[in-house]
């Protein structure tokens, strides 16, 4: 019994599972049909969108602003209805999925319990103990019954003592068979009692289990109701959270757009800054070139001035040497002449000759001193040249420093100018002092020369005057003494000049050391500043390179997006041409139907026209075909969607499969690849969200299409009922066909003809108003679906851009 019941429950569960699977398959089929209907509705929406644009133009030309406001309010109302329908569908879908998942889990649990009951693995010991307990209880009750029966039987046997007494003389072998004969029957009865009691106990346990199971099922149903209520509440909270999430998503998207705008502004500012830095660098290079030219010109001028000074010094030296040579030659010739005259003189003049020789020796010493002074002057000029060279070197160093430090402050330039002026003043002072000393030496030399000439003249006079020779000798001695004093004065003067020169050299060396130290410190500072400036320039160059790279990447992305947009425009233009062609055909068909309807309404006597109209209305594709094959345009648009899907599937496979991707170029770094993958994930997430929205819109459009079909069926039944009522009121019983009914309705001179026309006019007016409302609904849906289709079509393009760019 337990196994039979478990198998029945298992079969019932299997049937429930099969029903759920069939429902799932039906829902999937309905979803597929809804997708096909959505494709057809998209085509209709595109067509209605075109019609709406034309109608809007006509409205803008013909109608007033109030009617436009009414239409806009109705449009907003329909949008609100559409959103409410979407939310209802979401709630229903979520509840159905939750119930389905719960039922699946319950089915799995019940299958597991059934399997455990069949196998008996987990509770084998417990089941064995329960079976033994039942068997022992049944055996106990059976034994008790047997004991009672035996007691009754033995009581009856004790009442019959005579039978027992007669049997005492018999041998014991005859007494034993009487109790042994009923033993198998008692055992069978005992077993039968045991089995019966065991079955009773099992039946009681089974009833208890069924009652407990019913209580448990009722409890589970109550819990299911509570859970469904909780699920509804959670669904409502989920809808609220979904709306909040959408608002947050919109806010985040706006923030991202603001950040992108800020980034573009920062890029523009960086570009402007780099341009300014380039302009400043070019201006600095130009100023450096100008300063180099100026320093080169100054250097050339200094070199020319130095050469001119050297030429002047050389000419002065040569002139002085020539004059001294001439003077010495003249003096030597005169002395020789005088010596010849002195030799011709008497022996008295020997002393005078010796004195003259001494004077000549003194003159030679003076000449040697003059030569030494000239050598010292040359040394001084050489020192002056060395000082000038050092000054020029210093100027060159200062010029180089000035060229490297053009962008420094004006204070440092003024300090450098002050140092230069001080140095030039020192050089000018040293030069003036040297020139003054040279002039003094020249004056001393001239005075000495004049004195010597005067002495020579005096000697000539003394030679002429032989009489006053002694006086002249005395005068010469006095002159010799005076010359000795002049010699001492000259020696002292030379010592003072040497000491002053040594002091000046020491001072100049000290000043040169100080200047060198200052220049070394300044050079170190300038080198550090120059290194900092170079580092800044290098950083600016790196930033510029980075900006250039980002600009090139952005340009490439813009180019890729433009190419994708062109491709989409081409596809859209092809679809648009097809839709235009279909629109033209539909318009022609509508015009023909309108003409026929007008002919029927105007010509009330033409029966064939009305019959053809009704037959064409009954046999029209809009009556016979609904859903995915409502018109030719739906078929063409469905084919286009299939082509798009077939073209999108290899593109997705190319973008998703890592083996089919082309090798990554060497220019892309790991960070750029990570950014591309992140962008790909974001675009895929956006695409999935848009696909969900499109699915919801497809479901809502499918429901609207079903409403349209129902309304069209209601209109058909209304038309048919009205015609049947009219035919019954006229008393016609011939209902064999629609042609006979129409011929009865359109009899000439019939009174119901006007009522028929009025009903047809009312029906047409109602149909036109309904068509206008549906037009508006379809226009709203077309705008939404076109926007979503553009987003869905545009979202995979960024996924493929890196591959195309590679």
Curated annotation (Swiss-Prot):
GO cellular component: axon; dendrite; early endosome membrane; glutamatergic synapse; recycling endosome membrane; Schaffer collateral - CA1 synapse
N-acetylalanine modified-residue sites: 2
Site (Cleavage): 563-564
Listed Polar residues bias regions: 617-635
Modified residues (Phosphoserine): 620, 631, 633-634, 653, 655-657, 795
InterPro entries named among the record's database cross-references: GRIPAP1 (IPR026204)
Renumbered residue ranges of the record's region Disordered: 616-635, 646-671
Superkingdom, taxonomy of origin: Eukaryota
Membrane disposition: Peripheral membrane protein
Expression across tissues: Expressed in the central nervous system, including cortex, cerebellum, midbrain and spinal cord, and in primary cultured hippocampal neurons but absent in non-neuronal tissues and cell types with the exception of neuroendocrine insulinoma cells.
Keywords attached to this entry: Acetylation, Cell projection, Coiled coil, Endosome, Membrane, Phosphoprotein, Protein transport, Synapse, Transport
Modification note: Proteolytically cleaved by caspase-3. A minor C-terminal proteolytic fragment of 30 kDa is produced. Proteolytic cleavage is required for JNK signaling activation.
Stretches assigned to coiled coil: 4-158, 204-606, 666-700, 750-779
Binding partners and assembly: Interacts with GRIP1, GRIP2 and AMPA receptors. Interacts (via C-terminus) with MAPK8/JNK1 and MAP3K1/MEKK1; the interaction promotes MAP3K1-mediated phosphorylation of MAPK8. Interacts (via N-terminus) with RAB4A (in GTP-bound form). Interacts (via C-terminus) with STX12.
Summary of the function given for this chain in its UniProt record: Regulates the endosomal recycling back to the neuronal plasma membrane, possibly by connecting early and late recycling endosomal domains and promoting segregation of recycling endosomes from early endosomal membranes. Involved in the localization of recycling endosomes to dendritic spines, thereby playing a role in the maintenance of dendritic spine morphology. Required for the activity-induced AMPA receptor recycling to dendrite membranes and for long-term potentiation and synaptic plasticity.
Designated name of the protein: GRIP1-associated protein 1
The organism of origin for this protein: Mus musculus (Mouse)
